[in-house]
Amino acid sequence: MRSTYILIIVPLIIIGGGVVADNTNETPVLAHSSDEQPHQRLTYYNWDHKDLGTSAFEDLPPLQDQPTPLPIDQSDRCPDGWLRYSDSCYFIETESLGFAKAERKCHDKQATLFVANSMEEWDAVRDHAEKSVLSWIGLVRFSHYERLEQLPRWQTTGSINPSKINWLIKPFKPVVNGWSSYANCAASFQSPTEVESASYTFFYPCTMAFKSICERNSTILNARN
């Protein structure tokens, strides 16, 4: 019998991360420290492939090759409707989709699901996600390696330790944070309040329909292509 999953919202964290005052026709820029390092050389995990030993994803047509965007630097503007932080652009997807379709929609934008390279990036980007909803991020823990790895896996290597982000239950353990053989994918909830600990990350079945956060980063896309 399939388990029934109930979303329970409890008070957790919001960490502010303002937007630099934007001029009339400029891309919003998320505030960040000057010593922020860009993404390093990365390995990209293509979860659209069916070689991961999981039934979590829906069947989708094969991916089509996408051109790799030019590198993003501090002086570049992101596309309209995107935010910029360091060497990345971010798109807050407001359509509710299953994880696989959310990942595909990011790919169609020449992007990946959001992968945090630092806690500063994690806090700044989440602070501008849609409030009071769950958003897919590029973080999963598949059942085929559950006995070997306690931590979930970001969509690229070289990212922050997943145990450091704001899980619902800390210290991080997979099962108490919703993980099961049917709930492999992590989503982030961003509270509309400024109450400490009002936002959190939790595992859900990958077929549930949530919002999502896309990230366009030239280093990640080079690894993907």
UniProtKB/Swiss-Prot annotation:
GO terms for molecular function: carbohydrate binding; pattern recognition receptor activity. Glycans are attached at N217. GO terms for cellular component: external side of plasma membrane; extracellular region. The keyword Disulfide bond applies. Disulfide bonds join C106-C214, C185-C206. It is found in: Secreted. It comes from the Eukaryota. Keywords: Disulfide bond, Glycoprotein, Lectin, Secreted, Signal. Residues 1-21 form the signal peptide. One of its GO terms (biological process) is immune response. The keyword Disulfide bond applies. Pfam families: Lectin_C (PF00059). Residues 85-215 form the C-type lectin domain. PANTHER family: C-TYPE LECTIN DOMAIN-CONTAINING PROTEIN 180 (PTHR45710), RH26557P (PTHR45710:SF26). This is C-type lectin domain-containing protein 91. The gene is clec-91.
